[in-house]
Amino acid sequence: MLKDQLEPLLLKVQKPIRYVGGEFNSVVKDKKNIRTRMALCFPDNYEIGMSHLGLKILYSLINAREDCWAERVYAPWPDMEALMRENHIPLYGLESLDPLREFDFLGFSLQYELSYTNILNMLDLAGIDPLAENRTNDDPVIFAGGPCAMNAEPLCDFFDCFQLGEGEEIMLEFTDLYRKAKREGWSKQEFLIAAAQIEGMYVPSLYEVKYHEDGTIESVMPTH
């Protein structure tokens, strides 16, 4: 278990409490009763991410469903990241300590552009290919929301889809669709095509974007 691998490392880092979970009001569920697992990822350190109200709202909303489990993930500080890489420990959810590869969804909060490199680093630390085109049906669906999702194109190569607007209005419909896809054995592409019909959902792989020489967008054309 990751817990056994983590414990010796916690004595070597600043603020080990960042990496163990167990806070008051954190939600731990029995995995046997869970159909959909989601990691809510904040691409900054624990102190910044844990106080973010939007993350708390989505965490509460998803965990209100008995068969869904949302966990939290934050970017580790460089001292912990170095030890995780040295000891081959993948990035994990705080509640279960399970690797992110085992989740159905990874949802990233895009609050400011300076966090974008942290997103790629977190995916790499999780052992997940950052490029969407290289991922398979066995990888989690990786999506993003938040204020910077309104300018999605700089990150379109890395995400399967973007939630534009208020996440709590889209999230439950999104998870309901995934449960149907899982039950009926859809491929990831089939799920994304259906997800694109949800108002506020943008799936970059279903569009061709052309640019002017100065880097501004010339046109956005659907490919499906």
Feature roles, as predicted:
Residues T36-M38, D44, G49-R65, L110-S115, ...:
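General detector of N-terminal leader/presequence modules that precede the first folded domain
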Residues M1-K15, R65:
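Helix-enriched interaction subdomains in cytosolic or periplasmic regions
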Residues K31-N33, N63-E66, A194-A196:
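A generic structural signal for short, non-catalytic loop/turn and secondary-structure boundary residues
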Residues M50-D67, E168, E199-K210:
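Internal hydrophobic scaffold segments of catalytic domains
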Residues A75-P222:
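Glycine-rich beta-alpha loop elements in corrinoid/cobalamin-binding modules
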Residues M38, F42-P43, G49-L61, D67-M84, ...:
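Low-complexity, highly charged intrinsically disordered N-terminal segments
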